[in-house]
């Protein structure tokens, strides 16, 4: 029990000094609740408001694809070099050590794989389970321009509404309709719709022409998908151009774990995202770390 006989009156109240309330400066996030800001601050480094995510959730529709046959062997050694891990709850519980101490963006949608339209997804994780797993955000696809666009929008709305209740951010991942052109106009549309629905983070693709308009027209942070495996120099150039044009980070998978030197690649991407290195300097870092 506290000793009530030794309570001393406080003296240093800083009279005349206004209380300090630093603003939460992540794009579009200043009015969010404390818990949601706290989770976002674990995803996005508060010093740079940027992030390097390692995506290895591909198995939810691709199965044990190249590089993901054994998460414990191929991916676990990369954890310490990423800011954030993006995976499914099955992999998180079975393979990712809690002691890895990395924020997690939890894949929360899934459905078809090889037989029918991939865009026909459903919410695959209850928000209570995401909270139980100490996730920092949940992620679901939104398929603009597909037969199942309406369902995918309902999915993210469900997650957003539940997330607001629990202080859990939602990352909307823009899927591409098979009849849509992968251009600035499409990704601007998809990103803006997801943000208008209330998603706190958008994951979309980099395009060579007009990406700065995609980023500027989206009121919340955008992280780019790595997409298919590219030569390392090209992947780093894509990363640099995206950051230079307004992206708040990257969420790379195949361009990391299918690289011959994945740790070196993560270090090079980190240099671009957090240290503003250009692609040429980052590639030299990759070559140095590779050796």
Curated annotation (Swiss-Prot):
Enzyme Commission numbers on file: 2.3.1.245
GO molecular function terms noted in the UniProt entry: acyltransferase activity, transferring groups other than amino-acyl groups; fructose-bisphosphate aldolase activity
GO CC term, one of those recorded: cytoplasm
Active site: 203
Reaction it catalyzes: dihydroxyacetone phosphate + acetyl-CoA = 3-hydroxy-2,4-dioxopentyl phosphate + CoA
PANTHER family in the record: 3-HYDROXY-5-PHOSPHONOOXYPENTANE-2,4-DIONE THIOLASE, FRUCTOSE-BISPHOSPHATE ALDOLASE CLASS 1
Subunit relationships: Homodecamer.
Reported function: Involved in the degradation of phospho-AI-2, thereby terminating induction of the lsr operon and closing the AI-2 signaling cycle. Catalyzes the transfer of an acetyl moiety from 3-hydroxy-5-phosphonooxypentane-2,4-dione to CoA to form glycerone phosphate and acetyl-CoA.
Family listed: Belongs to the DeoC/FbaB aldolase family.
Protein name in the entry: 3-hydroxy-5-phosphonooxypentane-2,4-dione thiolase
Source organism of this protein record: Yersinia pseudotuberculosis serotype O:1b (strain IP 31758)
Species lineage: Bacteria, Pseudomonadati, Pseudomonadota, Gammaproteobacteria, Enterobacterales
Gene name of the encoded protein: lsrF
């Amino acid at each position: 029990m506290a000793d009530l006989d030794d309570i001393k009156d406080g003296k240093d109240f800083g009279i005349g000094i206004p209380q300090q309330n630093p603003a939460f400066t992540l794009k579009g996030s200043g009015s969010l609740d404390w818990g949601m800001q706290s989770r976002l601050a674990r995803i996005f480094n508060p010093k740079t408001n940027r992030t390097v995510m390692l995506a290895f959730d591909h198995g939810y529709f691709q199965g044990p694809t190249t590089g993901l046959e054994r998460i414990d062997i191929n991916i676990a050694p990369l954890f310490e070099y990423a800011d954030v891990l993006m995976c499914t709850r099955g992999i998180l519980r079975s393979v990712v050590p809690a002691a890895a101490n990395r924020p997690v963006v939890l894949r929360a949608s899934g459905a078809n794989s090889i037989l029918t339209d991939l865009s026909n997804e459903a919410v695959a994780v209850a928000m209570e389970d995401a909270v139980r797993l100490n996730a920092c955000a949940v992620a679901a696809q939104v398929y603009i321009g597909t037969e199942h666009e309406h369902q995918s929008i309902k999915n993210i709305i469900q997650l957003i509404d539940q997330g607001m209740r629990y202080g859990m951010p939602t990352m909307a991942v823009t899927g591409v309709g098979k009849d849509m052109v992968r251009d600035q106009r499409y990704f601007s549309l998809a990103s803006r719709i997801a943000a208008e629905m209330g998603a706190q983070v958008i994951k979309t693709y980099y395009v060579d022409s007009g990406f700065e308009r995609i980023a500027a027209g989206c009121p919340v942070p955008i992280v780019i998908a790595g997409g298919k495996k590219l030569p390392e120099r090209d992947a780093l150039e894509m990363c640099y151009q995206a950051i230079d044009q307004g992206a708040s980070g990257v969420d790379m998978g195949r361009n990391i774990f299918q690289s011959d030197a994945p740790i070196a690649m993560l270090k090079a991407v980190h240099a671009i995202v957090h240290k503003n290195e250009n692609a040429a300097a980052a590639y030299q870092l990759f070559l140095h770390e590779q050796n």
